[in-house]
Amino acid sequence: MDRIPFQATAAGSPYESIGTLPAAVLLDNVRSMYNVGAFFRTADAAGLEKLHLCGITGYPPKRAITKTALGAEASVPWEHAWEPVPVVEALRGRGYEIAAVETSAHAVDLFDWQPRFPVCVIFGHEVEGIRPELSAMCDTHVRIPMLGIKHSLNVATAGGVVIYELLRKYRALSNPAAPLAPYK
């Protein structure tokens, strides 16, 4: 079986015209450096605009981040801020929709959500979730559908699911000639 070189997997595809996905991620008090590294790697792969690392969330240079990110920490724009509220206020002032990823009852199903780009998606602490004051600032709350009994995903895994759903939806908006079938 012939292997396609990794660098060539997007060549000539409907993704070429996208360039950068007009989306950012804000990590609020994500404690695991490995999760932070995984977000860097996913952000790089999906062409995410920026990572905002807030509170106790680790930031480069940290060995555990580098180990998981595999160099993506050098290619993805990022910034650290101890307080996330001013970051959210600045993003909102620049026209971003602010969305929290939570398992709350009032959250919209990820596959039904129609994000307004540019968008910033917030992920919180692995156990405690997003701070209430930050959650209250969000324009929308989004949940990933879960059929199992745990109703829980690792935060970096959840990030991958949400980021790639954003890419799918943005591709359909930016390249109508090659839309993906909507979820029904």
Task: Please provide the spans of the model-predicted regions.
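Post-transcriptional modification and biogenesis factors for structured RNAs
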Residues: 1-184
